[in-house]
Amino acid sequence: MFVNSDFSDLLRLFNDNHVRYLVIGGYAVIQYAEPRYTKDLDMWISTDTNNAAAVYRALKAFGAPLVGLTEADFAEEGYFYQMGFPPVRVDILMGIPGGDFEQAWNNRNEVDFDGLVVSFISRQDLIDSKKASGRPQDLIDADNLSHI
């Protein structure tokens, strides 16, 4: 499903480090609807301190550029971290418009891709977050997801 093996490698490291993450954005839309172009892998993470430390460890093991960053940065609600360039960019978000991570985590959909279990935001939570964002592409995605 993922256009680049780096995405799978990163998700595997997140799983190995017990990171609580949800795939959101274009890849989540693709999971529930028809394929469409996406320029990045968007992940929403829990901002609790243990999870932030796990994210930092996983990113360090991945070889991500972390100069000037600390574990605490990944516990800051509203912060985001970006690495790479489209179409293999990764965006890690510590909050999304209208989102409650704990609720979304409880509603998550886990999908097994040849032994790699990936946590996706639920279809309904994805629709709600797309509507809350208000961006034109997100509103189109929400409408498409609502008619499945």
Annotate each PLM feature.
Residues 1-148:
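Compositionally biased terminal segments of proteins
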